[in-house]
Regions:
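Cys-dependent protein tyrosine phosphatase-like superfamily
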Residues: 1-155, 168-267
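Ser/Thr-glycine-rich phosphate-binding loops at phosphate-binding pockets of nucleotides
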Residues: 159-160, 164-165
């Protein structure tokens, strides 16, 4: 899967081209692009995305405060769509306590990671997104953008290009008929990108005397855990019957639109 990585000066930048989808057709090269944040990319990278990759839509899955703190760099000729797919319930006392402790941690990013891990919410993040109103409305809009795109590439991102972005990639690959094992392999490529970060965070957490539960969440904090996505997809299947039914009924992508997507993004 080395062909998925693209060297454009953005962390975790990959394209979904080459995977086998419905009827044995392949996902088109360089038209479905997933990345980490693009707020600090160079002018050269922005121009390359416009001229070489023909990016026509940028989809930003971050929350409002993330976008305000680090606005996207403008890509010439591309529409920028903000779709927050995760809006945590800040009336939840567990999350309120976490936010207070993270605020107390100040600039200590490691302590913030520890406080996040202690909530035990990491394992349920993808399930929360897929079942939430903001997640379903957001990914429905994402599919609308994919359907509206006629002559270029769509780039989507969050902060690190792993969770909200990874779920979006999984959904479009499902819609295109890509095998679930391949979808999971693509999802896990994030760990190759962030392997040094994962190792460094684990070492730091051990040095701080963190318990096994917190240390065990290292990969989910700095990378991704496949079992967490599997659990979310299994929950969707249990409630709705299949991922395709979820895409049709919860995200509003009709059978005709699914076929349209396949004609647009497979070859």
């Amino acid at each position: 899967m080395e062909d998925q990585f693209i060297d454009i000066g953005i962390d975790n930048a990959r394209q979904l081209g080459g995977y086998t989808g419905a009827d044995g057709r392949k996902v088109r090269q360089n038209v479905l692009i997933r990345t980490a944040g693009i707020n600090d990319i160079s002018d050269e990278t922005a121009e390359k995305l416009a001229s070489e990759y023909n990016v026509k839509y940028v989809v930003d899955f971050r929350m409002g405060y993330e976008r305000d703190a680090a606005p996207d760099k403008e890509i010439p000729g591309a529409a920028n769509e903000w779709i927050s797919v995760y809006e945590p319930d800040m009336t939840d006392p567990v999350l309120v306590d976490m936010m207070n402790k993270m605020a107390e941690a100040g600039d200590d990013s490691f302590q913030k990671s520890i406080e996040y891990a202690k909530t035990g919410r990491l394992k349920d993040l993808y399930t929360e997104i897929l079942f939430s109103e903001s997640g379903q409305k957001g990914y429905a809009k994402f599919f609308d953008i994919l359907l509206d795109n006629r002559d270029g590439a769509v780039l989507w991102h969050c902060t690190y290009g792993k969770d909200r972005t990874g779920v979006a990639a999984a959904l479009i690959l499902y819609a295109l008929g890509v095998d679930e094992d391949v979808i999971m392999q693509d999802f896990l490529l994030t760990n190759e990108v962030y392997k040094n970060n994962i190792a460094y965070l684990e070492k730091e957490l051990i040095s701080r005397g963190c318990d096994e539960m917190v240390i065990g969440e290292t990969q989910a904090m700095a990378g991704v855990k496949g079992e967490y996505l599997t659990a979310a997809l299994d929950a969707v299947k249990e409630k709705y019957g299949s991922i395709q039914v979820y895409i049709k009924n919860q995200l509003g992508v009709s059978d005709e639109e699914t076929e349209q997507l396949r004609n647009m993004y497979l070859e």
